[in-house]
Amino acid sequence: MKAYQRQFIEFALEKQVLKFGEFTLKSGRKSPYFFNAGLFNSGRDLARLGRFYAAALMDGGIEFDVLFGPAYKGIPIASATAVQLVEQHDVDVPWCFNRKEAKDHGEGGNLVGSPLKGRIMLVDDVITAGTAIRESMDLIQANGASLAGVLIALDRQEKGKGELSAIQEVERDYGAHIIAIIQMGDLIAYLEEKQAEQPELAVQLAAMQAYRAQYGI
């Protein structure tokens, strides 16, 4: 695990974006952890979040032309990432987002910002079922662009309805690379590191390991 990944886990815990416990997911599964990126909800949080996304993007090494943030959650993340790519890495890239409903007046259309062309890096919080990716692909392809990759905060590394995870299905269907700031394996490694000084984490660690054994890929 790299330093920025460990720092991101601690940031997510500090903001209660990441919680350990018992949570029922939309799928009906009982999960030993929950991740809600909507709780990164201040200016400082968003600036820090953008730095982590930018670090992961630079670390991933995938070439792209435009950052795209799908409405709604992807919009502030793509914006913050674009800002921090300049501030932290001196990399200036165009970015854009879509409207849920196209305007029929003014500038019109359903895209705001840079034209959606070339190799697109889609930016979002997590991939759960891959629905947002598939909807975005319709827009990307309609503009004659291609999907270079997907940048997310967390890869849960768990099976969907079949043997593949939603992320693996996206990789298979679109040939796109997925970059995640952290994966479930990083959360387990973090708990293993911290258990020596915080023995009470043993329960959470065991629950995470059991969950991975049952649903992991």
UniProtKB/Swiss-Prot annotation:
Q: Can you name a GO cellular component term?
A: cytoplasm
Q: Where does 5-phospho-alpha-D-ribose 1-diphosphate bind?
A: 26, 72-73, 99-100, 103, 105, 124-132
Record InterPro entries: OPRT (IPR023031), Or_phspho_trans_dom (IPR004467), PRibTrfase_dom (IPR000836), PRTase-like (IPR029057)
The organism named in the record is Aeromonas salmonicida (strain A449)
- Stated name of the protein: Orotate phosphoribosyltransferase
Role description? Catalyzes the transfer of a ribosyl phosphate group from 5-phosphoribose 1-diphosphate to orotate, leading to the formation of orotidine monophosphate (OMP).
Q: Among the record's GO biological process terms, what is one?
A: pyrimidine ribonucleoside biosynthetic process
Q: Where does orotate bind?
A: F34, F35, T128, R156
Subunit description: Homodimer.
